[in-house]
Amino acid sequence: MTKDSTTTPAEAGKDWFTTYTVFARPQGEPGWLGLEGRDAKKAAKEFDEAVARVAQTGVTVRGVYDVSGMREAGDVMVWMYGQVPEDLQAAIRELRRTRLLEGTTMVLSAMGADRMAEFNKDHVPAFAMGRKALKWLCFYPFVRSYDWYLLDPKERARMLREHGQLGQDLSLIHI
C-alpha cells in the first residue's frame, strides 16, 4: 500500500477481497519452530489474540490450513477476507509478528476480489453467506481473458452455468 492510496472504505466495501498467504518454517527446524508444551500453547494463544485484533478492523481469518506436503515450499496457509484491501495487508503484517509465524518465510501471498457474479446475482462465496469454514480448502482462479468479453453474453452465461454445474455433485465442496 502506498500513502497516496485513494481507496476509501465505502468504495472498497462494494466487494469482498481475500488473501491466501502461505508460510514456510525454516528447513531442519524441529516441530513447529521448536515450540513445545507450554510454549506452543502460549504461541497459539498469542496468535488467537492477534486474530481477534484484526477482526476489530473488519478482517476475518477464515481459516489456517496445513499445506505441508501440498506445496514444495510451504507449511501453513492463512485465508482471510475483508472489504478493504489495506486492512488485509495490515492483518498479514500483524499475524507475522506473532511467535507462531515470526520465524517463517512468506512463500506465497495472493489477493483476490470476489465480485458479484456476472449472470447469477445469487452466486456468492460461501463465506459471504455466513457458511462455516470447512476442514479442507479447494480454490482456483477463474481468470477471464480479453477474448472472454468478446463472446456473446448468452454464450458467456451458458459457459458459466455449465462451469458451475461441474461441482454441484461434490458434496464436500461449497460453491
Describe every region a protein language model picked out.
Residues 1-56, 83-87, 107-171:
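Short S/T/G/P-rich N-terminal loop/turn motif that feeds into the first structured element of a domain
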Residues 47-88, 92:
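Long, hydrophobic/aromatic-enriched structural stretches that serve as scaffold segments
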Residues 95-103:
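A common structural junction motif
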Residues 173-175:
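Conserved small/polar residues in nucleotide/adenosyl-binding loops
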